[in-house]
Protein backbone atom coordinates (compact mmCIF):
# COMPACT_ATOMS: atom_id res chain seq x y z
CA UNK A 1 0.00 0.00 0.00
CA UNK A 2 1.40 3.38 -1.00
CA UNK A 3 1.87 5.77 1.93
CA UNK A 4 0.76 8.77 -0.14
CA UNK A 5 -2.69 7.21 -0.66
CA UNK A 6 -3.22 6.75 3.07
CA UNK A 7 -1.98 10.27 3.81
CA UNK A 8 -4.39 11.86 1.29
CA UNK A 9 -7.34 9.97 2.75
CA UNK A 10 -6.56 11.32 6.23
CA UNK A 11 -6.39 14.98 5.12
CA UNK A 12 -9.21 17.39 5.78
CA UNK A 13 -11.06 18.95 2.80
CA UNK A 14 -9.26 22.25 3.38
CA UNK A 15 -5.87 20.53 3.24
CA UNK A 16 -6.89 18.59 0.12
CA UNK A 17 -7.84 21.85 -1.61
CA UNK A 18 -4.49 23.37 -0.62
CA UNK A 19 -2.66 20.41 -2.20
CA UNK A 20 -4.90 20.34 -5.27
CA UNK A 21 -4.59 24.07 -6.05
CA UNK A 22 -1.05 23.98 -7.58
CA UNK A 23 -1.99 20.99 -9.74
CA UNK A 24 -5.12 22.71 -11.04
CA UNK A 25 -3.14 25.91 -11.68
CA UNK A 26 -0.52 23.98 -13.66
CA UNK A 27 -3.23 22.35 -15.76
CA UNK A 28 -4.76 25.79 -16.44
CA UNK A 29 -1.39 27.24 -17.50
CA UNK A 30 -0.79 24.21 -19.74
CA UNK A 31 -4.16 24.76 -21.45
CA UNK A 32 -3.35 28.45 -22.01
CA UNK A 33 0.10 27.66 -23.41
CA UNK A 34 -1.33 24.95 -25.66
CA UNK A 35 -3.96 27.33 -27.03
CA UNK A 36 -1.37 30.04 -27.66
CA UNK A 37 0.81 27.50 -29.49
CA UNK A 38 -2.18 26.50 -31.64
CA UNK A 39 -2.82 30.17 -32.45
CA UNK A 40 0.83 30.54 -33.40
CA UNK A 41 0.57 27.59 -35.79
CA UNK A 42 -2.69 28.85 -37.30
CA UNK A 43 -1.33 32.36 -37.85
CA UNK A 44 2.17 31.29 -38.87
CA UNK A 45 2.01 32.94 -42.31
CA UNK A 46 0.69 36.17 -40.81
CA UNK A 47 3.59 36.25 -38.34
CA UNK A 48 6.15 35.63 -41.09
CA UNK A 49 4.78 38.57 -43.06
CA UNK A 50 4.81 41.07 -40.16
CA UNK A 51 7.75 39.92 -38.06
CA UNK A 52 9.95 37.60 -40.16
CA UNK A 53 12.95 36.91 -37.88
CA UNK A 54 11.78 37.78 -34.39
CA UNK A 55 11.05 35.53 -31.43
CA UNK A 56 7.38 35.77 -30.69
CA UNK A 57 6.21 36.22 -27.15
CA UNK A 58 2.82 35.07 -25.95
CA UNK A 59 1.57 38.66 -25.92
CA UNK A 60 2.67 39.12 -29.57
CA UNK A 61 0.77 36.00 -30.59
CA UNK A 62 -2.38 37.13 -28.80
CA UNK A 63 -2.15 40.66 -30.26
CA UNK A 64 -1.71 39.27 -33.76
CA UNK A 65 -4.68 36.92 -33.29
CA UNK A 66 -6.89 39.81 -32.11
CA UNK A 67 -5.74 41.95 -35.04
CA UNK A 68 -6.42 39.13 -37.49
CA UNK A 69 -9.91 38.52 -36.07
CA UNK A 70 -10.75 42.24 -36.22
CA UNK A 71 -9.60 42.35 -39.84
CA UNK A 72 -11.63 39.24 -40.69
CA UNK A 73 -14.72 40.66 -39.00
CA UNK A 74 -14.35 43.95 -40.89
CA UNK A 75 -13.92 42.05 -44.16
CA UNK A 76 -17.10 40.03 -43.57
CA UNK A 77 -19.02 43.18 -42.61
CA UNK A 78 -17.79 44.96 -45.76
CA UNK A 79 -18.98 42.07 -47.91
CA UNK A 80 -22.52 42.78 -46.70
CA UNK A 81 -25.07 40.53 -45.11
CA UNK A 82 -26.26 37.54 -47.07
CA UNK A 83 -29.90 37.00 -47.67
CA UNK A 84 -31.65 33.81 -46.71
CA UNK A 85 -32.13 33.05 -50.40
CA UNK A 86 -28.43 33.53 -51.10
CA UNK A 87 -27.47 31.20 -48.25
CA UNK A 88 -29.96 28.61 -49.47
CA UNK A 89 -28.68 28.82 -53.05
CA UNK A 90 -25.06 28.47 -51.99
CA UNK A 91 -25.85 25.49 -49.78
CA UNK A 92 -27.94 23.85 -52.48
CA UNK A 93 -25.20 24.35 -55.07
CA UNK A 94 -22.55 22.90 -52.79
CA UNK A 95 -24.71 19.89 -51.93
CA UNK A 96 -25.58 19.39 -55.60
CA UNK A 97 -21.93 19.40 -56.62
CA UNK A 98 -21.07 16.85 -53.94
CA UNK A 99 -23.98 14.57 -54.90
CA UNK A 100 -23.20 14.75 -58.63
CA UNK A 101 -19.53 14.06 -57.98
CA UNK A 102 -20.45 11.01 -55.90
CA UNK A 103 -22.98 9.72 -58.43
CA UNK A 104 -20.62 10.04 -61.40
CA UNK A 105 -17.89 8.05 -59.64
CA UNK A 106 -19.93 4.84 -59.64
CA UNK A 107 -21.38 2.67 -62.38
CA UNK A 108 -24.57 4.05 -63.89
CA UNK A 109 -27.88 2.66 -62.66
CA UNK A 110 -31.49 3.59 -63.36
CA UNK A 111 -31.91 5.27 -59.97
CA UNK A 112 -28.65 7.16 -60.43
CA UNK A 113 -29.80 8.47 -63.82
CA UNK A 114 -33.14 9.57 -62.37
CA UNK A 115 -31.35 11.44 -59.60
CA UNK A 116 -29.05 13.17 -62.07
CA UNK A 117 -32.06 14.21 -64.16
CA UNK A 118 -33.82 15.43 -61.02
CA UNK A 119 -30.80 17.58 -60.16
CA UNK A 120 -31.09 19.34 -63.53
CA UNK A 121 -34.25 21.10 -62.36
CA UNK A 122 -33.86 24.42 -60.51
CA UNK A 123 -34.18 24.25 -56.70
CA UNK A 124 -37.27 25.41 -54.87
CA UNK A 125 -36.57 28.58 -52.89
CA UNK A 126 -37.00 28.49 -49.10
CA UNK A 127 -39.80 30.40 -47.44
CA UNK A 128 -38.37 33.86 -46.82
CA UNK A 129 -39.34 35.99 -43.82
CA UNK A 130 -41.63 38.94 -44.58
CA UNK A 131 -38.99 41.60 -43.86
CA UNK A 132 -36.45 40.16 -46.32
CA UNK A 133 -37.17 40.80 -50.03
CA UNK A 134 -37.26 37.74 -52.21
CA UNK A 135 -34.81 37.49 -55.09
CA UNK A 136 -36.39 37.71 -58.57
CA UNK A 137 -35.35 34.18 -59.53
CA UNK A 138 -33.66 31.19 -58.02
CA UNK A 139 -30.02 30.78 -58.89
CA UNK A 140 -29.66 27.92 -61.35
CA UNK A 141 -27.70 24.93 -60.16
CA UNK A 142 -24.15 24.68 -61.45
CA UNK A 143 -23.76 22.97 -64.79
CA UNK A 144 -23.36 19.25 -64.49
CA UNK A 145 -20.63 17.46 -66.36
CA UNK A 146 -21.41 16.41 -69.94
CA UNK A 147 -21.29 12.76 -68.87
CA UNK A 148 -23.83 13.33 -66.09
CA UNK A 149 -26.12 15.44 -68.32
CA UNK A 150 -26.13 12.89 -71.13
CA UNK A 151 -26.73 10.03 -68.73
CA UNK A 152 -29.58 11.89 -67.04
CA UNK A 153 -31.29 12.74 -70.33
CA UNK A 154 -31.01 9.17 -71.61
CA UNK A 155 -32.42 7.67 -68.43
CA UNK A 156 -35.41 10.02 -68.03
CA UNK A 157 -38.74 8.24 -68.44
CA UNK A 158 -41.72 10.64 -68.24
CA UNK A 159 -44.24 7.89 -67.35
CA UNK A 160 -42.35 6.86 -64.21
CA UNK A 161 -41.97 9.41 -61.39
CA UNK A 162 -39.23 9.44 -58.82
CA UNK A 163 -40.29 7.60 -55.68
CA UNK A 164 -40.09 9.67 -52.51
CA UNK A 165 -40.68 8.36 -48.99
CA UNK A 166 -42.65 11.46 -47.92
From Swiss-Prot:
Gene Ontology biological-process annotations: astrocyte differentiation; BMP signaling pathway; brain development; camera-type eye development; cartilage development; cell adhesion; cell maturation; central nervous system myelination
InterPro entries in UniProt: bHLH_dom (IPR011598), HES_HEY (IPR050370), HLH_DNA-bd_sf (IPR036638), Orange_dom (IPR003650)
GO MF annotations in UniProt: DNA-binding transcription factor activity, RNA polymerase II-specific; DNA-binding transcription repressor activity, RNA polymerase II-specific; protein dimerization activity; RNA polymerase II cis-regulatory region sequence-specific DNA binding; sequence-specific double-stranded DNA binding
Sequence segments annotated as region (Disordered): 125-144
Sequence motif WRPW motif, location on chain: 163-166
SUPFAM superfamilies: HLH, helix-loop-helix DNA-binding domain (SSF47459)
Pfam families, per database record: Hairy_orange, HLH
Lineage top rank: taxon: Eukaryota
UniProt subcellular location: Nucleus
Ranges of residues in domain Orange: 88-119
Tissue expression as described in the entry: Expressed in fetal heart and brain tumors.
PROSITE patterns xrefs: BHLH, ORANGE
Keywords for the protein's UniProt record, in alphabetical order: Developmental protein, Differentiation, DNA-binding, Neurogenesis, Nucleus, Repressor, Transcription, Transcription regulation
GO cellular component, one term: nucleoplasm
Domain bHLH: 16-72
Domain notes: Has a particular type of basic domain (presence of a helix-interrupting proline) that binds to the N-box (CACNAG), rather than the canonical E-box (CANNTG).
Quaternary structure note: Transcription repression requires formation of a complex with a corepressor protein of the Groucho/TLE family.
Protein name, per record: Transcription factor HES-5
Organism classification: Eukaryota, Metazoa, Chordata, Craniata, Vertebrata
Gene from which the chain derives: HES5
Amino acid sequence: MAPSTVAVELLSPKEKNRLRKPVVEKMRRDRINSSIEQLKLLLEQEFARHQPNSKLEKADILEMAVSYLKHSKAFVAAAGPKSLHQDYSEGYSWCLQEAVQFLTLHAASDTQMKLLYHFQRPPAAPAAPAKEPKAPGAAPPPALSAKATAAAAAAHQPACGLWRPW
